[in-house]
């Protein structure tokens, strides 16, 4: 068989064979899932995504809707130096179990999913942005972690933005 034929066969059968030998696993609990880089239904249901109503500046969730443009108490008392920010997830025990392994445990496989969530949460900010720049990492910390998490997230969020 010629190499183009083998390549065509591999492109068709390769992913199926690979999934049979190494099935995609949930990013949260390592259960088998149908799609690589995704969460199982149980882990998905445990995540608390930030949704309106929230602070117009920092996106801290409100218990009830105070109206458009309202700032939370912290932003009203001491305005942050940024104009707007968004968060994909409420930082709780479940989201912490995803964030910390990404940040400190070499779980770069989490970047794509987190980037998609960030792109969805910050769609209006990304649409208005001329540039997305990650926070630089000190060279010592970069040496210890081997990668800049903010840079990976920024790259993935921009790639996933509509």
Task: Mark where each language-model region is.
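Glycine-rich phosphate/pyrophosphate-handling loop used in enzymes and phosphotransfer proteins
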Residues: 1-162
């Amino acid at each position: 068989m010629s190499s183009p034929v083998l390549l065509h066969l591999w492109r068709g059968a390769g992913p199926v064979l690979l999934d049979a030998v190494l099935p995609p696993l949930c990013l949260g609990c390592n259960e088998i899932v149908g799609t690589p880089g995704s969460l199982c239904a149980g882990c998905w249901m445990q995540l608390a995504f930030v949704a309106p109503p929230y602070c117009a500046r920092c996106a801290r969730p409100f218990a009830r809707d105070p109206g458009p443009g309202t700032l939370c108490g912290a932003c009203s008392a001491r305005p942050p130096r940024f104009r707007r920010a968004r968060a994909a997830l409420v930082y709780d025990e479940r989201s912490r179990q995803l964030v910390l392994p990404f940040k400190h445990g070499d779980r770069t496989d989490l970047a794509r999913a987190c980037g998609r969530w960030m792109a969805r949460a910050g769609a209006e900010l990304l649409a208005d942005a001329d540039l997305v720049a990650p926070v630089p990492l000190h060279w010592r910390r970069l040496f210890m972690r081997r990668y800049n998490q903010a840079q990976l997230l920024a790259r993935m969020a921009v790639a996933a933005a509509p």
